[in-house]
């Protein structure tokens, strides 16, 4: 079975550290942002207080107006993934291509799934039919001919197409210092990295670079005041200046680093700065495409002019696609595409109407109480299974271009994983279109973590490998570092996230090999302890564990031995206890303990996870409000995708902190404040109990603040109270 991944794809042992299931499919429910559910067999045990059936009817009526018709997620199993084979040497690669020099007909899944016919008017009830319809949205019938339009373009007289040593595009890709590059690549191969901490205009920064003797450490470029400080194509500068006449302080500070082709991890993305960051990465991507394209056209003209010369012009990769955007939803893709259009102002837009039909959804789906970050992610078309190619010519941008004919690829992790194909049928797998990617932009990485992060890892593992087929490649034009299998050392990776996590740090460490180094912008956090909006006692309890692989067991043991006894002791007065559990695997463990262990028989409980359907979640919320469920187990992903306004909460126990500090404020502050307003809780009587270990340092810093986190991790005492 291939990587279908509908819903939160399954988990292998621990979901690579997320402790949960994986990738959502079809947005927050049905296709194209629909409101339907699909899920596998579920554990259906909850213990309720024995009451008359009439009580259940009353509680249902009481919650009827409160419970939103929110849908949940569907889930699928995750597949075992094999490590790709080592790339073949250059000579073996050439021998493999000698049998056929002509572009072969496209035989991969992308041909039937890269782009789409218009959606059918009538919805299909059958899931398979529904999947086919959604995949059709991105179908492409175009033949593979990656360089055809470039060969037909006339060369334009443009002195800026000449090599400029001060232009990062040329110094990084076209004419890099061969000696320095070779030394740094060898250092990277030996995993010989070093780092330095510095300050930028907007935050602290950690610069990581390959350690080479007689080489100065890379420095963060100085801020710029306008677009004049960037090496842009003149025609792009003219159009982009209308949209970016002035730069805000963040853009001024971070733009030079992005345009220097260093890897970048920026972990303070939010709803206020997201548009400015999107403008920068789109401008950088289009500038890279234009420079690559114009250089190829100019060299085509030179070669045609001197047919019998020994002129060697290496300006290409194995395949045409150079930019990859990895995005969470079709709506986020729409925003990227619209920004690109605004910056480059093409004369013609081929297939634009079809693009709007497939990626636009104007219906307002959410009530006014949903927060800004939720709206940014889920309003519009929240389908998370898509992929689309964009091709640029001198006056036109074409949507739904065949992948091998495209300059920019935009895809969700699930959509791109399905385009690659299944590990079970390796002959049909195709990831050659990723072989020459020179820039990857991972936007809203925090949202991708709530999907199936293993799809993201899989994509990176199959990027910049030497291709299995020629795809019409002219090897006399391929840059030497491609032939040496060094393309991954030249690729730039840009990750934008609301916060940092171990997964992002690990991806930067294990899959980003840029010889120009890496820059991680590191925010200082004031914490959200004082932003709850009410007075509540907040107690943080640290438990010890020797290694990270023992941490789940240590956390559960601490919960059973130190947290539960007090609840059991006052079982009669434990009504309104919300236990927040970020990891789905931890949730299953705690749920099973509540369901089967006689020690907690006095505690009636309900559950809301990411797999709960609408009636199940509504019933659990109703029983919790009326007291039939004294305890409610609630997962982070359920909150991420639904943002339920739970009522009746009188105390909060956090089995672990959420990655998103906004969730802490909403759960610890918002829920308790609502109970005070409903007179379910006396003012100031709400309590919050948090479990944490030294491995939760990133989460803890965002909640308690940068100044407090060190003491809480290192001090001898293990309990910290805040009021």
Curated annotation (Swiss-Prot):
Main location group: nucleus
Any one GO MF annotation of this record: U3 snoRNA binding
Protein name listed in UniProt: U3 small nucleolar RNA-associated protein 25
Gene Ontology CC terms: nucleolus; small-subunit processome
Chain intervals for the UniProt region annotation (Disordered): 1-177
UniProt function note: DEAD-box RNA helicase-like protein required for pre-18S rRNA processing, specifically at sites A0, A1, and A2.
Superkingdom of this protein's organism: Eukaryota
Keyword Flavoprotein: no
Subunit structure: Component of the ribosomal small subunit (SSU) processome composed of at least 40 protein subunits and snoRNA U3.
Subcellular location: Nucleus, Nucleolus
Feature: compositional bias, Gly residues: 10-36
Biased composition (Basic and acidic residues): 41-51
Compositional bias of kind Acidic residues: 52-83, 138-167
Pfam families per UniProt: Utp25_C, UTP25_NTPase-like
UniProt organism field: Colletotrichum graminicola (strain M1.001 / M2 / FGSC 10212) (Maize anthracnose fungus)
Coiled coil: none
Keyword tags: Nucleus, Ribonucleoprotein, Ribosome biogenesis, rRNA processing
This protein's record includes keyword rRNA processing: yes
Organismal lineage: Eukaryota, Fungi, Dikarya, Ascomycota, Pezizomycotina
Record InterPro entries: P-loop_NTPase, UTP25, UTP25_C, UTP25_NTPase-like
């Amino acid at each position: 079975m291939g990587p279908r991944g509908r819903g939160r794809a399954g988990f292998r042992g621990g979901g690579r550290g997320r402790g949960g299931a994986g990738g959502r499919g079809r947005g927050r429910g049905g296709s194209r942002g629909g409101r339907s559910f699909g899920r596998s067999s579920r554990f259906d045990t909850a213990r309720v207080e024995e009451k008359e059936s009439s009580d259940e009817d009353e509680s249902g009526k009481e919650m009827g107006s409160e419970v939103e018709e929110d849908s949940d997620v569907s889930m699928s199993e995750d597949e075992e993934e094999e490590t790709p084979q080592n790339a073949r040497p250059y000579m073996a690669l050439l021998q493999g291509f000698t049998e056929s020099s002509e572009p072969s007909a496209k035989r991969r899944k992308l041909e039937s799934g890269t782009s789409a016919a218009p959606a059918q008017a009538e919805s299909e009830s059958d899931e398979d039919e529904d999947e086919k319809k959604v995949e059709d949205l991105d179908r492409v019938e175009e033949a593979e001919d990656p360089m055809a339009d470039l060969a037909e373009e006339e060369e334009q007289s443009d002195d800026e197409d000449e090599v400029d040593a001060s232009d990062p595009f040329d110094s990084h890709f076209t004419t890099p210092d061969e000696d320095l590059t070779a030394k740094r690549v060898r250092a990277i191969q030996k995993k010989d990295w070093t780092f330095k901490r510095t300050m930028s205009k907007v935050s602290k920064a950690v610069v990581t670079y390959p350690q080479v003797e007689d080489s100065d450490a890379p420095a963060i470029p100085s801020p710029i005041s306008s677009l004049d400080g960037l090496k842009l194509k003149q025609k792009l500068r003219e159009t982009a200046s209308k949209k970016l006449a002035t730069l805000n302080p963040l853009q001024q500070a971070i733009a030079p680093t992005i345009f220097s082709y260093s890897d970048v991890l920026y972990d303070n993305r939010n709803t206020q700065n997201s548009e400015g960051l999107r403008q920068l990465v789109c401008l950088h991507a289009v500038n890279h495409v234009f420079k690559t394209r114009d250089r190829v056209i100019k060299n085509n003209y030179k070669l045609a002019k001197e047919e019998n010369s020994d002129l060697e012009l290496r300006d290409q990769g194995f395949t045409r696609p150079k930019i990859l955007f990895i995005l969470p939803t079709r709506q986020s893709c729409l925003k990227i595409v619209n920004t690109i259009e605004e910056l480059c102002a093409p004369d013609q837009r081929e297939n634009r109407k079809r693009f709007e039909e497939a990626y636009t959804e104007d219906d307002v789906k959410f009530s006014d109480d949903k927060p800004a970050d939720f709206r940014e992610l889920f309003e519009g078309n929240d389908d998370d299974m898509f992929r689309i190619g964009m091709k640029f010519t001198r006056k036109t941008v074409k949507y739904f271009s065949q992948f091998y004919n495209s300059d920019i690829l935009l895809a969700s992790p699930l959509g791109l994983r399905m385009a690659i194909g299944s590990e079970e049928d390796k002959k049909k797998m195709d990831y050659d279109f990723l072989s020459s990617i020179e820039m990857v932009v991972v936007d809203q990485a925090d949202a991708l973590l709530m999907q199936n992060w293993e799809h993201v890892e899989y994509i990176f593992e199959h990027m910049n490998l030497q291709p299995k087929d020629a795809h019409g490649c002219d090897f006399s034009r391929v840059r030497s570092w491609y032939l040496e299998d060094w393309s991954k050392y030249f690729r730039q990776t840009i990750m934008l996230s609301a916060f940092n996590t171990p997964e992002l740090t690990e991806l930067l460490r294990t899959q980003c090999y840029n010889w120009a180094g890496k820059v991680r912008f590191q925010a200082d956090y004031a914490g959200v302890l004082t932003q709850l909006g009410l007075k509540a006692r907040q107690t943080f309890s640290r438990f010890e564990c020797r290694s990270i692989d023992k941490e789940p067991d240590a956390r559960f043991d601490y919960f059973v031995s130190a947290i539960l006894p007090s609840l059991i002791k006052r079982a009669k007065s434990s009504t309104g206890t919300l236990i927040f559990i970020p990891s789905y695997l931890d949730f299953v463990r705690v749920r099973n303990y509540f369901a089967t262990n006689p020690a907690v028989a006095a505690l009636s409980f309900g559950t809301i996870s990411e797999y709960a359907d609408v009636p199940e979640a509504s019933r659990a919320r109703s029983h919790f409000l009326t007291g039939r469920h004294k305890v409610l187990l609630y997962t982070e992903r359920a909150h991420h995708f639904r943002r339920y306004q739970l009522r009746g909460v009188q105390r909060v126990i956090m089995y672990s902190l959420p990655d998103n500090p906004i969730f802490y404020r909403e759960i610890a502050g918002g829920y308790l404040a609502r109970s005070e307003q409903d007179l379910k809780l006396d003012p100031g009587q709400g309590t919050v109990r948090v479990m944490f270990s030294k491995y939760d340092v990133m989460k803890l810093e965002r909640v308690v603040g940068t100044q407090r986190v060190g003491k809480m991790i290192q001090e001898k005492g293990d309990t910290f109270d805040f009021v």
